[in-house]
């Protein structure tokens, strides 16, 4: 596997820490050892997160190509757009963000706090759009790029989740290589890796990265899109493309992609009672915050699988914390009593 041939522009502090979730593990019976790898602590750029790791492999193209405006898209509380705005500010570029109405959630401050608030503070041109949730290429995003061109700018396209960019999966191939190095220091290998999946490139990169040591199907994706067929297809497609890019040496198959569909409901961006219980339990056992859109759902999945005995006794499970906590402010009504 050859990841080193791709240029990388450092936006993160370095390897993200792995630490044990001792109290949560004990609370769930102590038969499974839970750990977290903290992508939510990966950068000083506006709280960082998994998209910041991905952007390290996209930004060299933007710099070398002389692009002056980063153009991205997401929901109103998109973590992606906040991270793109931060990178643009860091690099001295302009930023245009299309924020679509991906979540059927009514709150008076939903479009004024959290991620979107930070993007505005960082100087991004934030454009609200009424279109609903979809993980594909969007007309509103294409229109934003055309607007930049007409104004004399040179837009660099960054699709939702970085996922439709040909190099969108590389950052999490690097994640897998980083985990392997940390496992050498820890003196053991993780048996399973749990990760949230929506647009697909995070899990796709992990699948390729861990395929290098035979653990592709030990990456347990927890769907948070509530459109799992579309998400699964995208994970598989991106993983196959990424495997070719890094010269993995074997094809990624359907069996390599594990996507658990039990925890994504009722729909994208809306937590269920299990999500909320998992957020509170993790926070109160470990002081580790997760959000109602992504990480709360993957945390719910991991907790439920431990409770159900789906991980064999003695397993070591690595939870990939991808970020997303800034969105908590937009859901403050749900937590008004804690």
Swiss-Prot record:
One of its GO terms (biological process) is amine catabolic process. GO terms for molecular function: 1-aminocyclopropane-1-carboxylate deaminase activity; D-cysteine desulfhydrase activity; pyridoxal phosphate binding. It catalyses: 1-aminocyclopropane-1-carboxylate + H2O = 2-oxobutanoate + NH4(+). Pfam families: PALP. Catalyzes a cyclopropane ring-opening reaction, the irreversible conversion of 1-aminocyclopropane-1-carboxylate (ACC) to ammonia and alpha-ketobutyrate. Allows growth on ACC as a nitrogen source. Belongs to the ACC deaminase/D-cysteine desulfhydrase family. This is 1-aminocyclopropane-1-carboxylate deaminase. The lineage of its organism: Bacteria, Pseudomonadati, Pseudomonadota, Betaproteobacteria, Burkholderiales. The gene is acdS.
